[in-house]
Structure formats: structure tokens, C-alpha cells
Amino acid sequence: MSDIADRVKKIVVEHLGVEAEKVTENANFIDDLGADSLDTVELVMAFEEEFNVEIPDDAAETIQTVGDAIKFLEKNSG
């Protein structure tokens, strides 16, 4: 697992208060991890801060799963 994946999963566990075992790449933030729309906005903000990257609104809307976040950040973070 990549460093980015580890960091994304840590952020998800901290922000959503879920068990680390539930945070898989296929886990949907809302359907599987119990996030609401505010939680997803806060997650995007946390990803932006952690990875020093801006996630445009249109891209943020496509980040539905842990794997989506990892792929976006692997492609766009320095």
C-alpha cells in the first residue's frame, strides 16, 4: 500500500470515527462508512490540507470512495 493510501485511510478513520478495517479502497464514504454531505466536504478539506493540493468542486464530486480519493491524490499531489 502506498504512503498516500495510508495517509488517506488515516484521515478517513480520524474524521469519520470508523474502524480502520472498514476503510477499504472500495468503501463508499456515504453508503459504507456512514458519512453525510458535510462529512464529505470536511474529508476533502482534510485531504487538501494533508497533501497541499486544491481539489476543485467538480473533482470533489467524483470522489465517492476511498479508492477515488487515493487515485486523485496520487495523480495530483506533488
Swiss-Prot record:
Protein name per Swiss-Prot or TrEMBL: Acyl carrier protein
Keywords: Cytoplasm, Fatty acid biosynthesis, Fatty acid metabolism, Lipid biosynthesis, Lipid metabolism, Phosphopantetheine, Phosphoprotein
Role summary: Carrier of the growing fatty acid chain in fatty acid biosynthesis.
UniProt keyword annotation of Transcription present: no
Native source species: Methylobacterium sp. (strain 4-46)
Pathway: Lipid metabolism; fatty acid biosynthesis
GO BP, sorted A to Z: lipid A biosynthetic process
Family, as annotated: Belongs to the acyl carrier protein (ACP) family.
Gene: acpP
GO cellular component: cytosol; membrane
Molecular function per GO: acyl binding; acyl carrier activity
Signal peptide: none
Annotated compartments: Cytoplasm
Location of O-(pantetheine 4'-phosphoryl)serine modifications: S37
PANTHER family found in the cross-reference section: ACYL CARRIER PROTEIN, CARRIER DOMAIN-CONTAINING PROTEIN
Classification of source organism: Bacteria, Pseudomonadati, Pseudomonadota, Alphaproteobacteria, Hyphomicrobiales
Sequence ranges assigned to domain Carrier in this UniProt record: 2-77
Post-translational modification: 4'-phosphopantetheine is transferred from CoA to a specific serine of apo-ACP by AcpS. This modification is essential for activity because fatty acids are bound in thioester linkage to the sulfhydryl of the prosthetic group.
Highest taxon listed in the record's lineage: Bacteria
InterPro entries: ACP (IPR003231), ACP-like_sf (IPR036736), PP-bd_ACP (IPR009081), Ppantetheine_attach_site (IPR006162)
Pfam families reported for this sequence: PP-binding
PROSITE patterns: CARRIER (PS50075), PHOSPHOPANTETHEINE (PS00012)
